[in-house]
Design a protein with these regions (language model features):
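Short, low-complexity disordered leader/linker segments with a strong preference
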Residues: 1-34, 324-328
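Flexible hinge/capping segments at coil-to-helix
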Residues: 28-30, 124-139, 230-233
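A local structural motif
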Residues: 31-34, 58-70, 85-87, 158-170, ...
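Extracytoplasmic "Venus flytrap"
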Residues: 32-51, 72-74, 143-145
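Pocket-flanking alpha-helical
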Residues: 46-49, 69-108, 117-130, 150, ...
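Pocket-lining segment of extracytoplasmic ligand-binding domains
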Residues: 94-95, 168-169, 173-262
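Secondary-structure end/capping motifs
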Residues: 229-307
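Conserved C-terminal helix/tail region of periplasmic/extracytoplasmic solute-binding proteins
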Residues: 298-328
Length: 328
């Protein structure tokens, strides 16, 4: 009997030891997680949360670190996602379509903007170009695969201009801006805050934008699919912090403007102009948005900028944002 008791006691001790090891391993695995967040040059609640340190504050509770990477436009986000160097980001409509067609594993987890005026085609104040028709034979700077890229080609198609009749120069914003200012290019297809910056400060003219063309450029929060499957609770936490920043911006607009002007080295008037063009949201990706995205994807396929047809609803998962917003 005593011998049997000793065996049982030993077995129980081993079980408790193994359970403790398993718990310790799981805990250390969580502590080893680093959330990699991408950010662009736009004025987004993502930037506010970064400057406030809210992501670090929230993820620290889980023993999780945060790493930030800045990108010039949407397409480079997906190169980083493909190589596991990015877990979250905020991008426009065209980059997600290109990435889906390329087979990159990402998920649209929320819709954050439904902008129309925030993307357009700029020309210099003294330019003789007054409409899209005048772009024939001209040099136009644009970031390949961006929302502005989509808008440019939609504008050309609407006016019956063959893409071969314009000289499209593919430049990221940090390259396109000096090229535009120096006159090396005749026009620049771009988004805010660059549009507001150049129209207010430099007298540039917008010859067309999403509102005039009836072309929206929605933005999305995205997550690396594998990361989202492995850490759904962190996806929800990410969305809660974004929502916190969005709500805070609405309630503390003057202070938010100061943060944006300081971070981007631009005037308060430019920030206000950007906000007049678009206000941030955090909502599920609706059926209407998916349908608009499908039209854009079909157009991109017809144009030849993506090599295969896609179904845009396949990359949408609203479950995270529905939980995050509901839990407010």
């Amino acid at each position: 009997m005593y011998k049997k008791f000793k065996v049982l006691s030993f077995a129980l001790a081993i079980s408790l030891f193994l359970f403790g090891c398993e718990k310790s391993t799981a805990s250390s695995k969580k502590e080893d997680v680093t959330v990699q967040i991408g950010i662009q040059q736009g004025l987004s609640p993502l930037l506010l949360a970064q400057k406030k340190g809210w992501f670090e504050e929230e993820f620290k509770k889980e023993g999780v670190k945060v790493k930030w990477t800045e990108f010039q436009s949407g397409p480079p986000y997906f190169e980083a996602i493909a190589s596991n160097r990015l877990d979250f980001g905020e991008v426009g409509n065209s980059p997600v379509i290109s990435a889906q067609a390329a087979g990159i594993e990402f998920t649209e987890i929320a819709n954050t903007s439904y902008a129309r005026k925030g993307t357009g085609i700029l020309v210099q104040k003294d330019s003789k170009i007054t409409s899209v028709k005048d772009l024939k034979g001209k040099k136009i700077a644009v970031a390949k695969g961006s929302s502005a890229f989509n808008l440019l080609y939609r504008a050309l198609e609407k006016e019956g201009i063959n893409a071969k009749d314009v000289n499209v120069i593919q430049l990221q914003p940090d390259e396109a801006q000096p090229a535009f200012e120096s006159g090396s290019v005749d026009a620049w297809a771009i988004w805010d805050p660059f549009i507001s910056l150049h129209t207010l400060n430099k007298g540039a003219k917008v010859i067309t934008d999403g509102e005039q063309l009836n072309v929206s450029s929605p933005e999305f929060l995205i997550a690396r699919t594998k990361f989202a499957k492995e850490h759904p609770e962190l996806v929800e936490k990410f969305l809660k912090v974004y929502e916190k920043a969005r709500v805070w911006q609405g309630s503390n607009l003057d202070e938010a403007i100061k943060i944006y002007t300081s971070a981007k080295k631009i005037d308060a008037e430019i920030v206000k102009e950007v906000f007049d063009h678009d206000k941030p949201i955090l909502v599920p990706v609706t059926k209407e948005i998916i349908e608009e995205q499908q039209k854009t994807a079909d157009f991109q396929y017809k144009l030849g900028s993506i090599k295969k047809e896609i179904k845009t609803d396949k990359v949408v998962d609203n479950s995270f944002v529905e939980k995050a917003v509901k839990a407010k």
